[in-house]
Amino acid sequence: MSQAFRTLALLGKANNDDVNQTINALYKFLREQNYNVLTETRLAHQLPCPAEHCMDIVELGKNADLAIVVGGDGHMLGAARVLARYDVPVIGVNRGNLGFLTDLSPHDFEVSLQQVLSGDYQTEHRFLLETTIYRHGEPKSSNTALNEAVLHPGKIAHMIEYSVYIDDSFVFSQRADGMIVSTPTGSTAYALSAGGPILMPQLDVMTLVPMFPHTLSCRPIVIDAHRQVKLVISPDNPDEQLHVSCDGHVTLSVHPGDEIIIRRAPHQLTLLHPKDYDYFNVLRTKLGWSNQLF
């Protein structure tokens, strides 16, 4: 048996009827089991929760043994980027679309969740990416991503000219609509849509997936996750703002001549799954792969 939990954090998208229904059911279930339940402040109005048990996500990270996130992968990504800094394990209840990161069904979560809370679960560690923008050699902005960091144009799609370095080794220069640098977790997200490979979550690698490159010879590259990726933006690009998006949530501004450093973050996400979790079953279900023929 693994660690059991007593103080639980409930997180979810506020003002969403489906999410609200599930959060209320979770809160009732957990309190009936005598768990200590903390919630996000923005959810406090819909739960009979004491004021001292309602707090922001940073305080939840400092006080909870386990976080239960209700929503889709997008909400899970937002919570994970913060909670990973506090080494708080996370499990998800799916109220989104695909739900690669949210295992529990909102309709019958009780048995699986009780097993997890009792210490009967699988543990998986997912690393994050740390992205920093340098301008004239000085750091200007930074953020983290669980799925991917994406270099892309602003409001109007156009080609970007940039060079790629792995550590200090020049790899190639390219004109493309952008570049996706993905973790294994993100290999079933944006990188998959751009033609990148599906990577098992346990692999310690990053994937570089160019977006619509203006060449026939360009292919995705898989590299050791302990390497550093540097994207150098050509000063010959049009003098307009480019962006790096972290998980599609946080946007960092990039100018011609800037350098983008992407490396493995110092912290990681601890993701919990029910005991019967199977990664390839998830892929088959979410991606609509055919069933076994014989």
UniProtKB/Swiss-Prot annotation:
Organism: Tolumonas auensis (strain DSM 9187 / NBRC 110442 / TA 4)
Superkingdom: Bacteria
Catalytic activity, reaction form: NAD(+) + ATP = ADP + NADP(+) + H(+)
Biological processes annotated in GO: NAD metabolic process; NADP biosynthetic process
GO CC annotation: cytoplasm
Family annotation (Pfam families): NAD_kinase, NAD_kinase_C
NCBIfam families: PRK01231.1, PRK03378.1
Catalytic residues in the record: 73
Protein name from the UniProt record: NAD kinase
Localization (cell): Cytoplasm
Similarity field: Belongs to the NAD kinase family.
Main location group: cytoplasm
GO molecular function term, any single one: ATP binding
Alphabetical list of PANTHER family matching this protein: NAD KINASE
Keywords: ATP-binding, Cytoplasm, Kinase, NAD, NADP, Nucleotide-binding, Transferase
EC number: 2.7.1.23
Residue positions binding NAD(+): 73-74, 147-148, 158, 175, 177, 188-193
Entry keyword annotation includes NAD: yes
Annotated function: Involved in the regulation of the intracellular balance of NAD and NADP, and is a key enzyme in the biosynthesis of NADP. Catalyzes specifically the phosphorylation on 2'-hydroxyl of the adenosine moiety of NAD to yield NADP.
Keyword Magnesium: no
InterPro entries per UniProt: ATP-NAD_kinase_N (IPR017438), ATP-NAD_kinase_PpnK-typ_C (IPR017437), NAD/diacylglycerol_kinase_sf (IPR016064), NADK (IPR002504)
Entry cofactors: a divalent metal cation
HAMAP family: NAD_kinase (MF_00361)
Enzyme class: transferase
